[in-house]
């Protein structure tokens, strides 16, 4: 789609149309000129990161012609980042997929054939055959799905019902496993409930901010702008930034800290020791609200059991812990002295002490922010727990301006992956498949026979790759992600399983990504406002939007695909006789009828949708399926501190932060006066735990799974850049963003480059024990690694940096460590 300057000028002048829709257009747009009623404006959350910025979408003749920041959004207040301003263009890439494509040869499916257009009916025919064969031959463990933190709430919920309730397989996991799983397990271990207790309002309340492994300036730029305003307009405010290399967030740092990879664990134990030694502990808070426990150590690295590191581990994968006293904890952290921390981390003592003083000062309200630097870590859960330790020791938690806060990278990693429970071990509202009571709640809510949901945890993301390679997972559906590019160790652990003739791989995507082109069947998928949706952002804010434009060609939403596919399976084909006998009324019914068209999900008629806002899925299925799915899903959490507002409310507001009780959202959880679930007089109650107390864990430093040695002499860290989002499958199709950062480069310290005879712009081969990739040397620019470390973004499909990375994971969260592996460099001679 080509939009002229005149088109954009007209769109931005559409004040009258926006006003008619109850929207506010920024003053700058009001000054553009003449208005037009031909453009319709409506609200939506942004499609990119987990900040949850509000956007106004302008549509005309079935196309998006403009977008701008929503000034009525409390998140971004009319501001978007550079990606947000180009949202319309992600929809209209020249290679947008509009038909199902199957690998075929001589008119038949062939694993080595060419992609050939087919109908949806034929696409589902081959999918049905492959899934039924896998179920018949090997059972529910032979089928699986890899979903997304970009799924809408009801897409994730429908997938959860189909996989765990329909196919009876817990082999459902989201790509959020690669980014937020350590945060999830960390919150659950310490507080018994997932997600931050604070909100973005903390930014305007805090006196200090500490960024742990978070480049907010590029990855969460709108929140960074709010923090920048707070820092520059209040002289007393301080910012500390910790990372293994310098990046743009360092430009505002009062205390810029570059540390040796993995030693963030040492630094946090030092800070805990400093707090105790300087009598900065909030003793009353600890006595009333905190327990102490010693965690298991030497827990391995989440590699295959045959790997030498796993064989050597004393307690591989152990989440065990035992009670301890405050005095025991004091003794434990005492060994993490300032001198030891400085020596191990490479950080000057004065910088470490300055950082510790921020946490220790009772007059300083402090927020800790982190993203992938903490979570993509072989001890990511520990890192999360250790950060909570600092806030619990000082009582700086669950109060305006103070608290630990994990920032999410996807628009609904919280709302869908975490809250809906699309992980292999989870169910909605923090319930888990290993808990019999939780399974019973789900089975009752879904009207399923007792015993339908398996109690064994399914395959997580990396385990799915291994099972595909081993031939034990044979029918596999990937939706709304590009894991062939984004996941670790492509050469050894992913590509072999995808191309194994025993396996059938389906990818649903709007574009021909690396993942799509590696699959056997590609299903064209609707994007963003081509469907009605809901996302949940990092501050627990649930936001809705209406379908605003049609999908191109034959593209269908993930929701439609999941629900329509359910029609292909009768209960007798997927459930054993003993389950069917419990529900004889289900005999002859298919999973669509049992899970979706069941008078619970299907009880909301089309008449509840405004005439001009009917969405494609509701029209196709004949009922307001989004409302039915949402209300059923919301029933899991209501009354249990996961309360969501009624469905219709969300279409009228700019999101609400749960728990929502009596129409009021909750800004700070666990604190009396803010949280309706804290009884009067208790002040603070961490009610996720049976005794209402959070846990401080004693956890040590343990080394990375792979470190530089004489041959592979450099650390490699991977990540993102401002202009591109994840694998670039959307942003690289925006000409302006592509031109701004057209290809990946290898950021390296100038002296490391010089020592290897490399110059800026040279081609260089980056080699690990698992693979190699050719990139370009960059010794200047926004990212400035220290000596001994190189940094490379993963957005470039022509430079698959995950050919290099190790599939080591945190043994507790199963999240991959993309920040630490060992590489060497070779100059490429032209």
Curated annotation (Swiss-Prot):
Q: Which UniProt keywords apply?
A: 4Fe-4S, Electron transport, Iron, Iron-sulfur, Metal-binding, Molybdenum, Nitrate assimilation, Oxidoreductase, Periplasm, Signal, Transport
Domain 4Fe-4S Mo/W bis-MGD-type stretches: 39-95
Tell me, in one coarse class, where this protein mainly resides.
periplasm
Q: What's its EC? A: 1.9.6.1
Functional description taken from the UniProt entry: Catalytic subunit of the periplasmic nitrate reductase complex NapAB. Receives electrons from NapB and catalyzes the reduction of nitrate to nitrite.
Q: What is this protein called?
A: Periplasmic nitrate reductase
Catalytic activity as recorded in UniProt: 2 Fe(II)-[cytochrome] + nitrate + 2 H(+) = 2 Fe(III)-[cytochrome] + nitrite + H2O
How does the annotation summarize its subunit structure? Component of the periplasmic nitrate reductase NapAB complex composed of NapA and NapB.
Question: Which first-to-last residue range defines the signal peptide?
Answer: 1-31
Q: Which family does it belong to?
A: Belongs to the prokaryotic molybdopterin-containing oxidoreductase family. NasA/NapA/NarB subfamily.
Residues noted as binding [4Fe-4S] cluster in the record, renumbered to the chain: 46, 49, 53, 81
Task: List GO terms (cellular component aspect).
Answer: membrane; nitrate reductase complex; periplasmic space
> Which co-factor is required?
[4Fe-4S] cluster; Mo-bis(molybdopterin guanine dinucleotide)
* Source organism: Yersinia pestis
Entry note: cofactor: Binds 1 [4Fe-4S] cluster. Binds 1 molybdenum-bis(molybdopterin guanine dinucleotide) (Mo-bis-MGD) cofactor per subunit.
């Amino acid at each position: 789609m080509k939009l002229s300057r005149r088109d954009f000028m007209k769109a931005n002048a559409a004040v009258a149309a926006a006003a008619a829709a109850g929207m506010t257009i920024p003053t700058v747009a009001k000054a553009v000129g003449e208005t037009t009623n031909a453009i319709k404006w409506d609200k939506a959350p942004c499609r990119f990161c987990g900040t949850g910025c509000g956007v106004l979408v302008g549509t005309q003749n079935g196309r998006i012609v403009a977008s701008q920041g929503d000034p009525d959004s409390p998140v971004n207040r009319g501001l978007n980042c550079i990606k947000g301003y180009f949202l319309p263009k992600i929809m209209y890439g020249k290679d947008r997929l509009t038909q199902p494509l199957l690998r075929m040869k001589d008119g038949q499916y062939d694993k080595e054939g060419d992609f050939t257009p087919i109908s949806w009916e034929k696409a589902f025919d081959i999918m049905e055959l492959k899934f039924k064969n896998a179920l018949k031959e090997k059972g529910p463990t032979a089928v699986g799905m890899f979903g997304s933190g970009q799924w809408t709430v009801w897409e994730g919920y429908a997938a959860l019902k189909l996989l765990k309730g329909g196919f009876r397989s817990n082999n459902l996991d989201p790509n959020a496993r690669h980014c937020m799983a350590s945060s999830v397990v960390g919150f659950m271990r310490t507080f018994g409930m997932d997600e931050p207790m604070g909100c973005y309002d903390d930014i305007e309340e805090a006196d200090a901010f500490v960024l742990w492994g978070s480049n907010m300036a590029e990855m969460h730029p709108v929140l960074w702008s709010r923090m920048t305003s707070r820092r520059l307009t209040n002289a007393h405010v301080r910012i500390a930034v910790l990372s293994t290399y310098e990046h743009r967030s360092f430009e505002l740092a009062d205390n810029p800290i570059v540390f040796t990879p993995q030693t963030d664990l040492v630094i946090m134990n030092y800070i805990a020791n400093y707090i105790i030694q300087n009598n900065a502990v909030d003793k009353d808070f600890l006595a009333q609200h905190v327990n102490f426990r010693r965690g298991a150590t030497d827990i391995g690295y989440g590699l295959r059991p045959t790997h030498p590191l796993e064989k050597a581990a004393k307690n591989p994968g152990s989440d065990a812990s035992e009670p301890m006293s405050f005095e025991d904890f004091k003794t434990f952290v005492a060994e993490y002295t300032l001198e030891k921390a400085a020596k191990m981390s490479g950080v000057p003592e004065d910088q470490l002490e300055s950082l510790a003083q921020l946490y220790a000062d009772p007059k300083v309200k402090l927020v800790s922010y982190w993203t992938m630097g903490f979570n993509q870590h072989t001890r990511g859960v520990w890192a999360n727990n250790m950060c909570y330790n600092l806030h619990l020791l000082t009582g700086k938690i669950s109060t305006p301006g103070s608290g630990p806060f994990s920032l999410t990278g996807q628009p609904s990693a919280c709302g869908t992956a975490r809250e809906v429970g699309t992980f292999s071990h989870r169910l909605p509202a923090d319930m888990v498949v290993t808990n019999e009571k939780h399974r019973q709640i789900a089975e009752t809510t879904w009207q399923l026979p007792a015993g339908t949901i398996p109690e064994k945890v399914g395959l997580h993301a990396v385990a799915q790759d291994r099972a595909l390679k081993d031939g034990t997972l044979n029918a596999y559906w990937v939706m709304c992600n590009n894991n062939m590019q984004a996941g670790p160790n492509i050469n050894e652990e992913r590509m072999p399983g995808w191309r194994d003739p025993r396996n059938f791989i389906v990818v649903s995507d709007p574009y021909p990504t690396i993942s799509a082109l590696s699959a056997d069947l590609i299903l064209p998928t609707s994007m963003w406002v081509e469907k009605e949706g809901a996302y949940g952002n990092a501050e627990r804010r649930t936001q809705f939007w209406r379908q605003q434009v049609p999908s191109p060609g034959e593209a269908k939403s993930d929701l439609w695909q999941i629900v329509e596919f359910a029609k292909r399976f009768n209960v007798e084909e997927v459930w054993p006789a003993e389950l069917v006998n419990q529900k004889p009324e289900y005999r002859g019914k298919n999973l669509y009828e049992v899970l979706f068209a069941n008078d619970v999900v299907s009880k909301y008629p089309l008449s509840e949708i405004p005439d001009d806002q009917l969405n494609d899925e509701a029209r196709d299925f004949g009922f307001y399926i989004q409302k039915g799915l949402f209300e059923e899903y919301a029933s899991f959490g209501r009354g249990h501190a996961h309360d969501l507002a009624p469905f219709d409310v969300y279409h009228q507001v700019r999101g609400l932060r749960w728990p929502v009780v009596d129409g009021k959202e909750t800004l700070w959880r666990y604190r009396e006066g803010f949280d309706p679930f804290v009884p009067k007089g208790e002040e603070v109650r961490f009610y996720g735990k049976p005794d209402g107390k959070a846990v401080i864990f004693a956890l040590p430093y343990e080394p990375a799974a792979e470190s530089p040695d004489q041959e592979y002499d450099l650390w490699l860290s991977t990540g993102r850049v401002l202009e591109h989002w994840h694998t670039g499958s959307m942003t690289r199709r925006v000409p302006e963003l592509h031109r701004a950062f057209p290809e990946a480069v290898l950021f390296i310290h100038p002296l490391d480059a010089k020592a290897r005879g490399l110059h800026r712009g040279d081609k260089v081969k980056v080699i690990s024990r698992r693979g190699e990739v050719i990139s370009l040397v960059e010794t200047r620019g926004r990212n400035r690694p220290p000596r001994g470390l190189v940094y490379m973004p993963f957005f470039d499909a022509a430079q698959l940096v995950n050919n290099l990375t190790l599939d080591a994971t945190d043994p507790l969260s199963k999240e991959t460590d993309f920040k630490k592996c060992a590489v060497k460099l070779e100059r490429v001679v032209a």
